[in-house]
C-alpha cells in the first residue's frame, strides 16, 4: 500500500507557493545536441509547500525493499522533489543549501526528498 498515492500529490497543489518543473542533468550528456524530449519519468516536480500546514510522517514498504519514505511533520517551509532520475543508493540532493533531508522511495518508483530550512 502506497503511503503517498498519486492522488495525494494533486491535493497538495493548493498549498504550493510555487510550482516548477525541473529537467535533471543527464550524466555524460550535459548539453545534448540536438535537444531531444526526455521521457516523462525523467522530469522532476518541485513543490514549495508550507510544511507547517501539513502532517507528513510515517513510512511504507516498497516492492523492491528500498528505503522507505520518512517525512518532516513540522517546519516553516520545505521543498518536495519528485522524479525517477535517482537510483537506489544515490540521493537526489536538496534544492536548498545546508538543509536537512530525508529520502525515500514510493513503490511507484518515484523518488522523493523532503528538505527543511
From Swiss-Prot:
Partially overlaps STE20. This is Putative uncharacterized protein YHL006W-A.
